[in-house]
């Protein structure tokens, strides 16, 4: 066996072994905990969001309702959220420093505007020269958990890319609760990768550009831009 072939096999084996099969990060509280502990956790979550970003009261209320549902039913953790709102109003900050911090789960950010095709996420076949696994496996490696929070930014920009439909179809498959427990990376054919516990969060500006099937999977939380009074308050703080 050649050195090149050996290195290729070594990369494949190490990449597979590094996948955190069966590992996940539990919620900081459960339904079995006391009422006071659950109440304190919800208050802490609201404090995290308020410290992360000013305003967005309605959006924060929706997020607290969703987290309350997860406390009651942890098995529903594999969810698809979406934060809609104008550019520059703090959607990503709300997700990273509000939601991810409160859930205490590893967080990864993916800029969809920079994705060229679905292979960016799903990898290339092992037989190709210089092939490797895709971005999703990369994220699982880095997070060392099967239930990270993955934030896909600028979903509405995907339709403007050359292979936008291909990427959207991949996202539809990835967020389908009936089949995302059997996600496969092209680099690891025949090996099921369970994404059912991942929290997918999409952010976008223009809701009219979102694929209808994908949008039906989402719990959409709408945010507004800041008015002059809000901007003065932010500047003062």
Model features per residue range: what roles?
Residues 163-164, 187-188, 192-193, 205-218:
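Short regulatory helix/loop adjacent to the ATP-binding pocket of P-loop NTPases
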